[in-house]
Curated annotation (Swiss-Prot):
Biased composition (Pro residues): 141-159
Group of enzyme by EC: oxidoreductase
Function per UniProt: Ribonucleoside-diphosphate reductase holoenzyme that provides the precursors necessary for viral DNA synthesis. Allows virus growth in non-dividing cells, as well as reactivation from latency in infected hosts. Catalyzes the biosynthesis of deoxyribonucleotides from the corresponding ribonucleotides. The N-terminal region confers antiapoptotic activity in differentiated cells such as neurons and is important for viral reactivation to increase neural survivability. Prevents host necroptosis by targeting host RIPK1 and RIPK3, thereby hampering the formation of necroptotic RIPK1-RIPK3 complexes.
Site (Important for electron transfer): Y1118, Y1119
Biological source species: Human herpesvirus 2 (strain 333)
Gene designation: RIR1
Chain span(s) of sequence motif RIP homotypic interaction motif (RHIM): 55-75
Lineage: Viruses, Duplodnaviria, Heunggongvirae, Peploviricota, Herviviricetes
Protein name: Ribonucleoside-diphosphate reductase large subunit
Length: 1144
């Protein structure tokens, strides 16, 4: 609509004959009147209408429907005088039409009478906040409104008006709005308005300009139909405001606040003249209460000297002090605002923002050497967070006057996070906002780029430092482009600050380096370190693959940076911590097989090879099969394992990144029963207890063949245990060769024979009680390896059971990891396979750079690493992607998507590895020995494999046979427990463990809700039904299936199942569907639930393990997690050890 005049309250409403036709809405100029309210307490209508600003109180604001501490717009002005409630609509008096335009709400109109008004009525439209927007007022160009009405009687004093009203300049100037930085004045549109303006000028002695205060993020241009004020009783007459985005600090929206009474003869304020108008000192109608309120609003006497002491700094007429952040100025403004900050917690932020803006005009552009300082954008980001929290009706503490310093701003953010953290269990919005506050807290500990690059604790690579200096200007521009506040203002995607509280805390507590005593590298600096190093070490062939040409360092930097910062690709934890530094240890997984046969040799291997790996925080899979010299009544391996247990505990005690070790044995080892009893309550005596290490069984097919015979009803099925003297060759063979040798030893009467069900029960009991042993299938691993291992069979895996490598006394298996975030590939419920291919390609290039540049802790590790160049590209967020697409893991659509994703990942990874060889890189050392040399693929050994990209596979086959592959193995599906937290997605390929993750530590409770579920609940329920639904979920451990059993099977909420709600055989089948395209293995956890009586039948786990064996998996069980029958949580084994190496 065209700009309409501000309707003078003294000018009555136009008659129906004078109404004009509605006009098209248009953006109004900045400015406008505000209404502030506090929950359902009184509402103050503030007018900037000449001849003098005045405030009018609406005593009952229940009809406003505006929530807590909202900022609303008045499209026009209101009549001078007192507004009081009107029970019924009448045709006399002034009206205030208040429109509720919140999302989903219908417009509502409240009619309020203007006391003592004798002229026609006038209306004022008040628009509340729209969903997702925070509104600032916009003024209207004055327009003649008819004859002036007789001034109304003076209003009675309003209790809180003095606290948010305008303040008079400390030197006696005109009264200004709090926080105003610019003046605004509408030219008179009629003689009567001109006279009023002149009269106002005489009263105040400083002109008729009015200034505004605002503390919200968004600006709005209010629109109204020209005839909307003709009938305030009609809902249809109230039109929503048109929202115009602008930065909250770009300038105020004009608002005139009521003049406080100022003592004209006060010795403490010698230059202050007496105010005029209702409630002023010269107004004989002012009451004693009004006088007291006005006096309380006056600045203190010590404000003026502050002004005089800083003559070179610009002074904002809305504040009694210069726009310079000093303790004296901040305290003066705090006294100036008084108790108003209790109603408007962010009131101090506008002063901080104005000061920061003034400072930015004086400082040069940011460089590497620029000292970190809080900027206008930082205060704006905090203000955005506070405004969002106020929309949630939270009672916020006021921003302290010293919060302009990094330390006190950090303390204030911490107070908010700790205070409201428990509420994130029911609010996805609050979960996101608290994450923003943690990122702001990180910002307060940021150092300059120069300090960061020179830090000994960070210890940047020399070559990287030189490259960063060469591109200083570009990096500063990129840093500003990724400013979170700018991204919020311009609706630019910034997934970093959108990921939520857990993501931000994980960055702060774990991934960001500390240096210089109290500094912390920023998230931008961390990803600059990683991407910059990758760009430095990228070869010419890699640049051609990534960019399609020979690009520059800066182009390669951006290629990696954006995919890392956006979490399309995620490095492993050691890579994220060490890439770009001179600590070049980035490998995650180590497979060690010392083949020691004596106690002394085993101890040397543990204290030498194993200890060196632990010192570099590597996760270890240790094969102990060869050490098997038990004598009757003793366990040969347990003393050595006790040494290993103590060694792991010692390394983890002072480490910020704990690691672990897993001991692999075959089930015929003479000490297998002792190992199954070495953890937790199963440990018979302290000398046998090993709570800091894990165990895993390397199961041959023969064991399950016999177990199935027992389950089918066959009697007296046995299993034999052998010691070293009779079993030296068993570990070297697999398949039929192993079975022949094993049965031959039995036939000769060697070994100890036990019922097979006894050992099966011991395995299941240990798994259900301690979470381990892990179970891997020896024959499946060796059967699908890239070359024949008969006679030197692979004897173990890594700590998390997803890496497949041969290892021996001379060579240890080593793998470098990375993962792709599948949830980032979903857009509008569609999976983008093009983005997936791009992410896998980038991940393969990243891991190859890691392989080229990493150091190894031992010669054995270096030998195995260089010979095979093995990588493990994993996935995270599979379940999150499924939910974002509106699918269920049980659906046929997802079963197809699951296989499709796995095939694309392997295809893209192998094509990239082959492209490196095409561009001149040498194939891995054992390529000619591998099945790839003959043109065979991993998936071709699976009868259920049906690739959909047969043409691409055939082209790759020909190129692979001609040029080779740079890497020996590609896809390994690890848990991604740590990195999934900073991505804020589900771990690996597993379903969500729970819809509300809760962990209590000495630092408090950590909560991570399923935000997709919370949003779906809000779409489904409302009001009390929503609260009831969440109460039910709380009572049922956030299991939708148990809390809301009455939902229709097709209801969208039915999709939000936890891992325990799914049939575990289905999860095994999903792993089997992916298996042809996973050339390493999958860390498959089983989730089982106790029966109502608190028991867990052994047959439950046995049945699942047999099913995994029959489906041909390599990993039968990583963890076994048990949901207790009572509401006491989930037992997942001993969590004193957290693998952050292989688990990413």
């Amino acid at each position: 609509m065209a700009n309409r005049p501000a309707a003078s309250a003294l000018a009555g409403a136009r008659s129906p004959s004078e109404r004009q036709e509605p006009r098209e809405p248009e953006v109004a100029p900045p400015g406008g009147d505000h209404v502030f309210c506090r929950k359902v307490s009184g509402v103050m209508v503030l007018s900037s209408d000449p001849p003098g600003p005045a405030a009018y109180r609406i005593s009952d604001s229940s009809f406003v429907q505006c929530g807590s501490n909202c900022s609303m717009i008045i499209d026009g002005d209101v009549a001078r005088g007192h507004l009081r409630d009107l029970e019924g609509a009448t045709s006399t008096g002034a009206f205030v039409a208040i429109s509720n335009v919140a999302a989903g709400g219908d417009g509502r109109t409240a009619v309020v009478a203007l006391g003592g008004t004798s002229g026609p009525s006038a209306t004022t439209s008040v628009g509340t906040q729209t969903s997702g927007e925070f509104l600032h007022g916009n003024p209207r160009t004055p327009e003649p409104q008819g004859p002036q009405a007789v001034p109304p009687p003076p209003p009675p004093p309003f209790p809180w008006g003095h606290e948010c009203c305008a303040r008079r300049d400390a030197r006696g100037g005109a009264e200004k709005d709090v926080g105003a930085a610019e003046s605004w004045s509408d030219g008179p549109s009629s003689d009567s308005e001109t006279e009023d303006s002149d009269s106002s000028d005489e009263d105040t002695g400083s002109g008729s300009e009015t200034l505004s205060r605002s503390s919200s993020i968004w600006a709005a241009g209010a629109t109204d139909d020209d005839d909307s004020d003709s009938d305030s009783r009609s809902d249809d007459s109230v039109q929503p405001d048109v929202v115009v985005r602008r930065r909250w600090s770009d300038g105020p929206a004009p608002v005139a606040f009521p003049k406080p009474r100022r003592p004209g003869d006060s010795p403490g304020n010698p230059g202050l003249g007496a105010g005029t108008g209702p409630g002023s000192a010269t107004d004989p109608r002012a009451s004693a209460d009004s006088d007291s309120a006005a006096h309380a609003a006056a600045p203190q006497a010590d404000v003026a000297p502050v002004l005089d002491s800083q003559p070179t700094v610009g002074t904002d007429p809305g504040y009694p002090v210069p726009l310079e952040l000093t303790p004296e100025n901040a305290e003066a403004v705090a006294r100036f605002l008084g108790d108003a900050v209790d109603r408007e917690p962010a009131l101090m932020l506008e002063y901080f923002c104005r000061c920061a803006r003034e400072e930015s005009k004086r400082v040069p552009p940011r460089t590497f050497g620029s000292a970190p300082r809080l900027t206008e954008d930082d205060f704006g980001l905090l203000n955005y967070a506070l405004a969002e929290m106020r929309r949630l009706c939270l009672d916020l503490p006021p921003v302290p006057p010293n919060a302009y310093t990094p330390y006190h701003l950090r303390e204030y953010a911490t107070r908010l996070v700790n205070g409201f953290k428990p509420l994130v269990r029911r609010s996805a919005r609050l979960y996101r906002i608290l994450g923003i506050l943690v990122h702001l807290r990180i910002r307060t500990r940021e150092a300059s780029f120069e300090e960061w690059m020179r830090s000994k604790e960070v210890d940047l690579d020399f070559g990287l430092t030189e490259r960063l200096r060469e591109h200083e200007a570009q990096l500063m521009i990129l840093a500003q482009a990724l400013n979170p506040y700018d991204c919020l203002i311009h609706s630019t995607p910034n997934t970093l600050v959108e990921r939520g509280l857990q993501s931000a805390l994980k960055y702060e507590e774990f991934y960001l380096k500390r240096f210089g005593g109290h500094y912390m590298e920023s998230v931008f600096q961390m990803y600059t370190r990683i991407a910059g190093f990758l760009a430095c070490r990228a070869t010419r062939g890699m640049r051609h693959i990534a960019l399609g040409r020979q690009g520059s360092w800066w182009e390669m930097f951006k290629f990696f940076f954006h995919r890392l910062y956006d979490h399309q690709i995620v490095p492993s934890t050691p890579a994220m911590l060490n890439l770009g530094t001179r600590n070049y240890y980035t490998s995650s997984c180590y497979l060690v097989n010392p083949q020691a046969t004596t106690n002394q040799a085993t101890l040397r291997a543990i204290t030498g090879n194993v200890s060196a790996i632990l010192a570099r925080n590597g996760g270890i899979g240790l094969c102990m099969q060869a050490f098997n010299d038990a004598s009757p009544g003793t366990a040969s391996i347990m003393p050595a394992l006790k040494v290993l247990d103590s060694l792991v505990a010692a390394h983890n005690k002072q480490s910020t990144r704990p690691t672990g070790a897993c001991v692999y044995l075959e089930p015929w080892h003479s000490d297998v029963r002792a190992v199954l009893r070495m953890k937790g309550v199963l440990a018979g005596e302290e000398a046998q207890r090993c709570d800091n290490i894990f165990s895993a069984l390397w199961m041959p097919d023969l064991f399950f063949k016999r177990l199935i015979r027992h389950l089918d009803g066959e009697k007296n099925v046995t299993w034999s245990l052998f010691d070293r003297d009779t079993s030296m060759s068993l570990a070297d063979f697999h398949g039929e060769e192993f079975e022949k040798l094993y049965e031959h030893l039995e036939a000769m009467g060697f070994g100890e024979t036990i019922p097979i069900q006894d050992l099966a029960y011991a395995i299941v009991r240990s798994a259900a009680t301690t979470g381990s042993p892990f179970i891997m299938f020896k024959d499946a691993v060796n059967r699908h390896y890239i070359y024949d291992t008969q006679g030197a069979a692979i004897a173990g895996s890594n700590l998390c059971t997803e890496i497949v490598h041969p290892s021996s006394k001379r060579s240890s298996g080593v793998c470098n990891l990375g993962s792709v975030n599948l949830a980032r590939c979903v857009s509008r419920r569609t999976f983008d396979f093009g983005m997936l291919r791009d992410a896998v390609q980038a991940c393969v290039l990243m891991v190859n750079i890691m392989i080229d540049s990493t150091l190894q802790p031992t010669p054995q590790c270096a030998r195995g690493h260089d010979n095979l160049r093995s990588m493990g590209i994993g996935m995270q967020g599979l379940h999150t992607a499924c939910l974002k697409m509106g699918l269920d893991l049980e659906s046929a659509e997802f079963r197809d998507l699951n296989t499709h994703i796995a095939e694309v990942m392997l295809l893209a990874a192998m094509k990239t590895s082959n492209a490196l060889c095409v561009r001149g890189a040498r194939p891995f050392s054992h390529f000619k020995r591998s099945m790839y040399r003959a043109g065979r693929f991993h998936w071709e050994r699976f009868s259920n494999a049906s690739p959909r990209y047969e043409g691409e596979w055939e082209m790759l086959r020909q190129s692979m046979m001609k040029h080779g592959l740079r890497n020996s193995q590609f896809i390994a599906l690890m848990p991604t427990a740590a990195s999934a937290q900073i991505s804020d997605v589900s771990e690996g390929f597993a379903p969500l463990f729970t819809n509300l993750f809760s962990k209590v530590t000495r630092d408090g409770e950590t909560l991570r809700p399923n935000t997709l579920l919370l949003k779906e609940l809000e779409r489904t329920f409302g009001g009390k039904r929503l609260l009831d639904a969440m109460d039910g979920l709380e009572a049922k451990q956030w299991s939708v299936a148990q809390a809301l059993p009455c939902l229709d099977p097709a209801h969208p909420l039915r999709r939000f199942k936890t891992a325990f709600d799914y049939d575990q055989e289905l999860l095994i089948d999903l792993c089997a569907d992916r298996a042809p395209y996973v050339d390493h293995s999958q860390s498959m956890t089983l989730y089982v639930t106790e029966k109502a009586d608190g028991t867990l039948p052994a047959s439950t786990l046995v049945r699942l393990l047999v099913h995994a064996y029959k489906r041909g998996l390599k990993t039968g069980m990583y963890y076994c997690k048990v949901r207790k029958a009572t509401n006491s949580g989930v037992f997942a084994g001993d969590d004193n050890i957290v693998c952050t190496s292989c688990a990413l």
